[in-house]
Amino acid sequence: MKYVGAHVSASGGLANAAIRAAEIEATAFALFTKNQRQWRAAPLSDETIAEFKAACEKYHFGPGQILPHDSYLINLGHPVEEALEKSRDAFIDEMTRCQQLGLTLLNFHPGSHLQQIPEEECLARIAESINIALAKTEGVTAVIENTAGQGSNLGFKFEHLAAIIDGVEDKSRVGVCIDTCHAFAAGYDLRSAEACEKTFAAFERIVGFQYLRGMHLNDAKSAFGSRVDRHHSLGEGNIGHDCFSWIMQDSRFDGIPLILETINPDIWAEEIAWLRAQQIAEVA
C-alpha cells in the first residue's frame, strides 16, 4: 500500500499537522516537531503529546506513515568540535521528541564539511553523530536524506549515504529518504521510466532498498545535474510526470511515507489524488 501525503504545518499545535493532513486526504505526512530555524524549543508537554497521539489515532496515521524532519540548523558533520557538539545535542533532542510522540522515524540532512575537512572525515563524523544519538534514544530510526549537493553539503551521491550507513553500528535504526528533486539536481536522471529504472538500480546496488524509509516527491525547477535545490509542482518542472507515475506503480515504494514538498500547498490535495490514480494507470 502506498502512503501519500505532504509536509504540513504544525502551527498552533502538533495535533494540527494530523488534522491538516486529513483535510487533503493524505495517508502520510511530514512535520517539524519544533521551529526548524531555532536551536532550542520548550519541552513537549504531556498535553501536547496526548493531543498529537489522539489526532493521529483519529485520522488513522500510524508511526510508519509519519516522517518528521529535524531542524535545518543541525550539521552532524560539522568540522568544528564545539559546533558539532551543539548539533549533536540538538539532534538527540529531536530524536527524543519523536520518541515521546510515539514516532519511529526522523528525517535529516546529513551534513556539510564547510570546505574545512575532507569528505571522508565529514561522513565519518555524521555516522558517529548517529551512533551517539541512537545510543541515547530508543525506537526511532535516523533517516538520512539525499541532498542536491549545494555548497559543501554531502549526501548528494548514493555512495555518501552508503558510507554513512556503513559507519552506523545499529543498522536496524538507520535508513534513507530519497528526494526526487535532490537526486535529479545531483545528476540522477528521472525523466523517463527507463531513467528511473537505471537510477534506482544504482540505488539498490550501492545503498539497498532495505534502507529506504521514505521519499520526498518533488519536481525540479533546477536543471539536471545543476546541484541546485529548487522544488516544483509535479509535472511542472524538469523531471515531468513519468517519474511519479513509475514510483506509484512500483511495489518497492510501498509501506513508506511518500511526501510532497512541492511549492503550491493549494494543490496538494489534487497532487495526492493524481498520484493515487497513477497506481492503475500506465506510464506513457
UniProtKB/Swiss-Prot annotation:
Residues that, per the record, bind Zn(2+) 2: E145, D179, H216, E261
Catalytic activity field: Endonucleolytic cleavage to 5'-phosphooligonucleotide end-products
Residues holding Zn(2+) 3: H182, D229, H231
GO biological process, one term: base-excision repair
InterPro entries assigned: AP_endonuc_2 (IPR001719), AP_endonuc_F2_Zn_BS (IPR018246), Xyl_isomerase-like_sf (IPR036237), Xyl_isomerase-like_TIM-brl (IPR013022)
Residue numbers binding Zn(2+) 1: H69, H109, E145
Cofactor note: Binds 3 Zn(2+) ions.
Pfam families referenced in this protein's UniProt entry, alphabetically: AP_endonuc_2 (PF01261)
GO molecular function, one term: DNA binding
Cofactor needs: Zn(2+)
Keywords tagged on the record: DNA damage, DNA repair, Endonuclease, Hydrolase, Metal-binding, Nuclease, Zinc
Top-rank EC class of the record's enzyme: hydrolase
Enzyme Commission designation: 3.1.21.2
Biological role stated in the UniProt entry: Endonuclease IV plays a role in DNA repair. It cleaves phosphodiester bonds at apurinic or apyrimidinic (AP) sites, generating a 3'-hydroxyl group and a 5'-terminal sugar phosphate.
Similarity remark: Belongs to the AP endonuclease 2 family.
PANTHER family named in the record: APURINIC-APYRIMIDINIC ENDONUCLEASE, ENDONUCLEASE IV ENDODEOXYRIBONUCLEASE IV
The protein, known as: Probable endonuclease 4
Taxonomic classification: Bacteria, Pseudomonadati, Pseudomonadota, Gammaproteobacteria, Enterobacterales
